[in-house]
Amino acid sequence: MTNIGDHNAAHGAEAAGFRDLKAVHWNFEAPRLYEEALSRKEAQLARGGAIVATTGSHTGRSPKDKFVVRDAGTENEVWWDNNGAITPEQFETLRQDFLKHAEGRELFAQDLYGGADPAYRVKARVFTEFAWHSLFIRNLLIRPDRSEIASYVPDMTIIDLPSFQADPARHGCRSKTVIAIDFSKKLVLIGGSAYAGEMKKSVFTYLNYILPGQGVMPMHCSANAALDAEGGSAIFFGLSGTGKTTLSNDSSRQLLGDDEHGWSNSGIFNFEGGCYAKTIRLSRNAEPEIYATTERFGTVMENVIIDPVTRVPDFDDASLTENTRCAYPLDFIANASATGRAGHPKNIVMLTCDAFGVMPPIAKLTGAEAMYHFLSGYTAKVAGTERGLTGPEATFSTCFGAPFMPRHPSTYGNLLRDLIAKHSVDCWLVNTGWTGGGVGTGRRMPIRVTRRLLSAALDGSLAQAEFRRDPYFGFAVPVSVPGVEPHILTPVKTWANKGAFVETAARLVKMFDDNFKRFEDHVDADVRSAGPTAQAIAA
């Protein structure tokens, strides 16, 4: 095979099992990857300089097609209620078929890092069939210095072949699409999907598996830090589409990252070196920092419609999917951290997209309440972030990221609770979903309200406010906040039909109670008592 580009010649594609490849293009940067993607007609050039690719039938993740090898090493470590299993034999058959499928093809390889803290960093080598996928993952992960490449030996490997189609009978999977992880072999195989987000989430899943054993809390969150040392850092938990990227992009604070972080004894650190922002209905006025990246050379836009003549993106066009995205390096954001690291957080924000419209825009949580709501992970799946999802759907995604958590949620919940207590962190639940009614009758929470409330929480003033006890959920809600209309802080006052509000709130409370039954045997009594019904009875 022909090797083009800088790489470790002693540990090349053969080490991953490849044979008879036509060529491997190693560690290409944006200009060369643009040339390759455009000449192969994988993508188009948008006005402003970004590259635009479409992903076919898969415009979001395929969580039901994700599998973990069940072997002696994972049998008692993986949360099998939440993770599909395949046998080592099925994975090996799949691996051999992947390698056979790759014969005679040209692949692109990137040698990258997952984790900004060198103490917990993972070397991730990613082989892709598409040049634009190679640029995507290069943007999203941490790029090593060129001097490090000659001796680079990966800790994990990803092989992404969208043209490969799995055989459920042969490979033990569900469809022609497969995302299979063998933690023992430190190998991820992605086939049958061109959705680039599968690659970054595979690295995240791997880190979520290995880091708890090192005393590090892996988190599906964005993070930023105050510009002065006194303000501290903040973590924003939330499922895709709840506002993690938008709300952590704040010009008055330094951005660490928008999606994946770790919390160790030294502080918090980004897992990535880029951002993967939703662009549907993106506007220059509302989100200027993110909008500016769509006009930069090097940005990858995914499933964004562009004018066939002018090549101007139409961010309001959801004809392919609501889940339009752009992927760009962190240094495209002017206020991004150069190190991806910060001290221990002073605030934790749990973002929920309440599809019922009965939760307040912000609530202050005790440590026990924080663990309860972290394990509950109530939100709404937003249209487009998963295949087949067309409208908001109320759901409970434990740890605000169940699809990426290989271990039992209590593993992550206990780590989080201990860290909150140790560092005296203020915790907040923020509703970025609906107010004045649920989906169809209410409206989305105004982003200006959310930003004002977050500003008060992060500068420390909100913690000193007067609070009331919410009669349905039990947590503390501020009575008033400067710059926010008082009625919006009390959800029932935003509903025209008060009786419908009471019925809807009671229905959601029951959903919380029913969902948490699966965790009751894994948590202490104070956490069991932190749920809505238990607090209402106690009151």
Curated annotation (Swiss-Prot):
Its EC number is 4.1.1.49. Substrate binds at R61, Y195, K201, R325. GO terms for cellular component: cytosol. It is found in: Cytoplasm. Its cofactor is Mn(2+). Mn(2+) binds at K201, H220, D259. It catalyses: oxaloacetate + ATP = phosphoenolpyruvate + ADP + CO2. GO terms for molecular function: ATP binding; metal ion binding; phosphoenolpyruvate carboxykinase (ATP) activity. Pathway: Carbohydrate biosynthesis; gluconeogenesis. Keywords: ATP-binding, Cytoplasm, Decarboxylase, Gluconeogenesis, Lyase, Manganese, Metal-binding, Nucleotide-binding. One of its GO terms (biological process) is gluconeogenesis. Binds 1 Mn(2+) ion per subunit. It holds the Pfam family PEPCK_ATP. ATP binds at K201, H220, G238, L239, S240, G241, T242, G243, K244, T245, T246, E287, R325, T450. The keyword Nucleotide-binding applies. It comes from the Bacteria. Belongs to the phosphoenolpyruvate carboxykinase (ATP) family. PANTHER family: PHOSPHOENOLPYRUVATE CARBOXYKINASE (ATP), PHOSPHOENOLPYRUVATE CARBOXYKINASE ATP. Involved in the gluconeogenesis. Catalyzes the conversion of oxaloacetate (OAA) to phosphoenolpyruvate (PEP) through direct phosphoryl transfer between the nucleoside triphosphate and OAA. This is Phosphoenolpyruvate carboxykinase (ATP). It comes from Methylobacterium radiotolerans (strain ATCC 27329 / DSM 1819 / JCM 2831 / NBRC 15690 / NCIMB 10815 / 0-1).
